[in-house]
Amino acid sequence: MTNIRKSHPLIKIINNSFIDLPAPSNISSWWNFGSLLGICLGLQIITGLFLAMHYTSDTATAFNSVTHICRDVNYGWILRYLHANGASMFFICLYLHVGRGLYYGSYIYSETWNIGIILLFAVMATAFMGYVLPWGQMSFWGATVITNLLSAIPYIGTELVQWIWGGFSVDKATLTRFFAFHFLLPFIISAMVMVHLLFLHETGSNNPTGIPSNMDMIPFHPYYTIKDILGLLIMLTVLLALVLFSPDLLGDPDNYIPANPLNTPPHIKPEWYFLFAYAILRSIPNKLGGVLALVLSILILAIIPLLHTSKQRSMTFRPMSQCLFWLLTANLLTLTWIGGQPVEQPYIIIGQLASILYFTTILILMPLLSTLENHLLKW
């Protein structure tokens, strides 16, 4: 008799995806982040579901309902902070996952890569709408500023913004629809994750050398299940340390002030994981130009497969490209820092230089250096 795990219509899909899946024998811990992202998504959906049971999406009661969750609901405080800091862990894993893809040339699998970019946009949209829900000062003003950027779109901009707001300002209708979409999107993301995995399993995983590993594969279970559990334990340790010791470390104190349309906070800024894009937006003195740069800062990932000029897939054996990759990483950290600073010198010029360097590195320096490396290796 065949093993049920290999014959049952449903279980065999799970078996072929997570148990008997052939995986390269040499993939490093950088390949852990996919499973960590799946766990983050599951955690966010579960904590979010329980929070939604007690939250009210009305401007008069939203702020108080979050306070009620923290004070009166059994373990409500841990649900709320797991959800808020879980989002931070989600983005740390996301950025490391994308960085891994860039470093090891995983973008050559273009279907998987493109679905990944759409997933990144969807997660960013979900996180933005979630930040609006507690209805604190930064929630309200963040929603106002970011949605207002759409008014830069020629001809339809103003109407589009008012259509999204459901009125002439961010108000009751905006909060209700943001809650509806914030609840819905994670389930759409879950479906897209399945498509992401479907395309990945068509080609199989890449590996640190960038060389096909079809002749040297091992089963996913037990080797990589155990390896993923180690990654999970490390992530959970960091998350629980954040939640239990300093839950507000990554948040903004202004969000503990109820939303007040008549009082603007001195520095409007998004959560830390959007600061690099916010810095790029602010570095361009023109509204439409800034919005375009903001979108392109993420959308640029879509053309990276076209900019791959190297004869090697991975950066493992390309020390010059490695230097450029770490320069890009340092540049993104600089942009993140600048995004949280007030709009004054020297921050303005640093932000502008870092923004120029970001696009220059990806669009010009990386392809040129890859070509130079080919010549140096006489390829």
UniProtKB/Swiss-Prot annotation:
Its cofactor is heme b. Keywords: Electron transport, Heme, Iron, Membrane, Metal-binding, Mitochondrion, Mitochondrion inner membrane, Respiratory chain, Transmembrane, Transmembrane helix, Transport, Ubiquinone. The lineage of its organism: Eukaryota, Metazoa, Chordata, Craniata, Vertebrata. Binds 2 heme b groups non-covalently. A ubiquinone binds at H201. Heme b b562 binds at H83, H182. It is found in: Mitochondrion inner membrane. It is a multi-pass membrane protein. Belongs to the cytochrome b family. The cytochrome bc1 complex contains 11 subunits: 3 respiratory subunits (MT-CYB, CYC1 and UQCRFS1), 2 core proteins (UQCRC1 and UQCRC2) and 6 low-molecular weight proteins (UQCRH/QCR6, UQCRB/QCR7, UQCRQ/QCR8, UQCR10/QCR9, UQCR11/QCR10 and a cleavage product of UQCRFS1). This cytochrome bc1 complex then forms a dimer. GO terms for cellular component: mitochondrial inner membrane; respiratory chain complex III. Pfam families: Cytochrom_B_C, Cytochrome_B. InterPro entries: Cyt_b/b6_C (IPR005798), Cyt_b/b6_C_sf (IPR036150), Cyt_b/b6_N (IPR005797), Cytb/b6-like_sf (IPR027387), Cytochrome_b (IPR030689), Cytochrome_b_C_euk/bac (IPR048260), Cytochrome_b_N_euk/bac (IPR048259), Di-haem_cyt_TM (IPR016174). This is Cytochrome b. Heme b b566 binds at H97, H196. Heme 1 (or BL or b562) is low-potential and absorbs at about 562 nm, and heme 2 (or BH or b566) is high-potential and absorbs at about 566 nm. It comes from the Eukaryota. One of its GO terms (biological process) is mitochondrial electron transport, ubiquinol to cytochrome c. The chain crosses the membrane at residues 33-53, 77-98, 113-133, 178-198, 226-246, 288-308, 320-340, 347-367. One of its GO terms (molecular function) is metal ion binding. Component of the ubiquinol-cytochrome c reductase complex (complex III or cytochrome b-c1 complex) that is part of the mitochondrial respiratory chain. The b-c1 complex mediates electron transfer from ubiquinol to cytochrome c. Contributes to the generation of a proton gradient across the mitochondrial membrane that is then used for ATP synthesis. It comes from Cistugo lesueuri (Lesueur's hairy bat). Gene3D superfamilies: Cytochrome Bc1 Complex, Chain C (1.20.810.10).
